[in-house]
Amino acid sequence: MSEQHDGHLRATYNEIHTLIGKAAERIEKEYAPDFAHTFVGGGGFFPARVLRTFLKHPESKRNISIQAIGLSLYEELPSTTEEQMANEVVRTQWLGPETKTLLGRKVLIVDEVDDSRTTLQYAVRELQKDVEKELLLLPESERDAKRPKFGVFVVHNKLKPKRGTLPADVPYFSGEDIPDVWFDYPWEVKDVYEHDRMAELGRKLQAKSA
């Protein structure tokens, strides 16, 4: 077998499952969400489903709800401004009347990786805008109590300068910080056994170079 490696980072399903489980302990302690959103081309579906298992209430057996939004990001130009960045994010799936179900909730936005943070910025900003529209339909005395809180969880956070930003009052959780290199997830490949083999090879080569 050739020892050639493409330099990509990889993790197996089991490793990601375990990583999410450890992160769930922090999320439950510090945020305790009761609603989850997955987004960005489906990358958050698997993490959100695993996270729901770990956040399931031990006594009531109540699961957090999961709804999906989809975002696609075009390649950004070096001269991109914040407004232009937002315009480059395209909605492929979004909430409609379901937005009102967020009122009064602690929402957790879930994705696989925080790369440029552009899509995370867009998701938080646009969901907050939609929620504010729903709040205007309520009596003013009820709005503060019904305003939802938003948090973010990503499996991996790339250590790099971010183009996007998140509000200071939005809790942010990551399973693991990683270098700014391409990361291959097992749900993106057809041959998961080859994926796992390459993941193991990468670890061996990294150990040799350490």
Name what the model sees in each region.
Residues I20, G44-A48, R52, L120:
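Short, highly selective alpha-helical patches that border small-molecule cofactor pockets
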Residues K29-Y31, L55-K61, L95-T99, Q128-A145:
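Alpha-helix termini
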Residues I16, L51, I109-E112, Y185:
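Generic structural signal for small/hydrophobic residues in well-ordered secondary structure
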Residues E59-L108, D114-R125:
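Short, glycine/charge-rich flexible loops or terminal/linker lids adjacent to PRPP-binding catalytic cores
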Residues A36-T38, Q67, L108, K149-F153:
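A structural signal for isolated positions on well-ordered beta-strands in alpha/beta enzyme cores
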Residues Y31-G41:
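Short glycine-rich phosphate-binding loop at a beta-alpha junction
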Residues S2-E3, R125-A210:
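PRPP-dependent phosphoribosyltransferase catalytic core
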Residues M1-P33:
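Active-site-facing substrate-recognition patch
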